[in-house]
Amino acid sequence: LCGEHLLLAGHKATGKNVLAENLAAVFGRPVWDVSMYVNVDAAALIGADTLRGGQVEFREGPVSKCARLGGFGVLDEVNMAKNEALAVLHATLDHRRVIDVPGYERIHLDEATRFIGTMNYGYAGTRELNEALVSRFVVLDMPVISDENLKKLLRRSFPTLKDQWAEQ
């Protein structure tokens, strides 16, 4: 990954999340799955103040935990979130590699931290990502596997698989 974050783009069922999880496994890093949806906000990503024992303290969100602990953060369906929520990730994903938490210390990304965005094209609720965000990723377009290649893969992986199941 050479220090880069990835954006895996393509149609549904092309293995984007499977690839992201396998990359984390190959590198031996923990994974934080971050579901991006239309109403996700900065607090859901970075964290927010909470009351514990009469004291206000910061409760980390999945992005800040991943950043601090050197994990792989999978930003699932990143093109469903609004720009306002995604803007908090700009300094995280660019050369600064920091998260600014208002009222708290800056969180510097662990050297091993990587973020992998996934997105589908052209489905209800999705939209184009702005250029500023896309420029912070290496974009990989995931191809759709042909029926013929899927059958070959299934037969190679499961030699005893009956033809009727491979043909479905």
Question: Predicted segments — roles?
Answer:
Residues 1-168:
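AAA+ P-loop NTPase catalytic core and its hallmark functional loops
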